[in-house]
Swiss-Prot record:
Lineage per the UniProt record: Eukaryota, Fungi, Dikarya, Basidiomycota, Ustilaginomycotina
CDD domains per UniProt: GLOD5
Gene assigned in the entry: RDO1
Name of the protein in its database record: Glyoxalase domain-containing protein RDO1
Gene3D superfamilies documented for this protein: 2,3-Dihydroxybiphenyl 1,2-Dioxygenase, domain 1
Null mutant phenotype: Does not affect the itaconic acid nor 2-hydroxyparaconate production.
Annotated pathway: Secondary metabolite biosynthesis
Active site: E168 (proton donor/acceptor)
Classification via Pfam families: Glyoxalase
InterPro entries in the record: Glyas_Bleomycin-R_OHBP_Dase (IPR029068), Glyas_Fos-R_dOase_dom (IPR004360), GlyoxalaseI/FosfomycinResist (IPR050383), VOC (IPR037523)
């Protein structure tokens, strides 16, 4: 038995369905008048968004020059774009740099240097990476340790950038 609110809803739905047929209204794909009184604009087709890849991310730093120096010692390239903006490039990815207090809009709700934990896959062996880091005065804070990457086992070492972001350098080849 229908409650009065359900009965009103069915009547409204039936009236809407009749109006749609009489006026030949075209509904968006997947929408239909409902016998339960849910108007088409209230119906949501359950569709998944399909994210393809990561284009860029943003690191907020205290000192742009120190940050650029650190990441170029890891093999990244610095690029300028827009009006005085700087980014780090590697592979087909980019890290945009924002200086604390001079962030570009829109920005993170609380842009904070030192809050990142990033993992970079390297072409080199972990042993070669450790040697490179030592030659460039970058201290390994942990590792090598076995971890699980996005596509399987990895071997990783950890360092900290000038803002104390945790940077993981990983090799899939060394994990085999």
């Amino acid at each position: 038995m229908l409650r009065s609110s359900q009965a009103r809803s069915v009547v409204r739905s039936s009236q809407w369905a009749t109006t749609a047929r009489v006026h030949q209204l075209e509904l968006p794909s997947g929408w239909k008048p409902s016998a339960l009184g849910v108007a088409p604009w209230q119906q949501r087709q359950q569709r998944q968004l399909s994210v393809r890849s990561l284009d860029h991310l943003v690191i907020t730093c205290h000192d742009m020059d120190k940050t650029i120096d650190f990441y170029t010692r890891l093999g990244m390239s610095v690029v300028q774009f827009g009006q005085g903006r700087k980014a780090l490039e590697f592979g087909s990815q980019k890290i945009n740099l924002h200086q604390k207090g001079k962030e570009f809009e829109p920005k993170a709700l609380v842009p904070q240097p030192g809050s990142q934990d990033l993992c970079f896959v390297i072409h080199d062996s972990i042993a070669d990476a450790q040697k490179h880091l030592q030659e460039h005065g970058i201290q390994v804070v942990e590792g090598p340790v076995k971890r699980t990457g996005a596509v399987g086992p990895i071997l990783s070492i950890y360092v900290r950038d000038p803002d104390n972001n945790l940077i993981e350098l990983s090799s899939y080849q060394d994990a085999k």
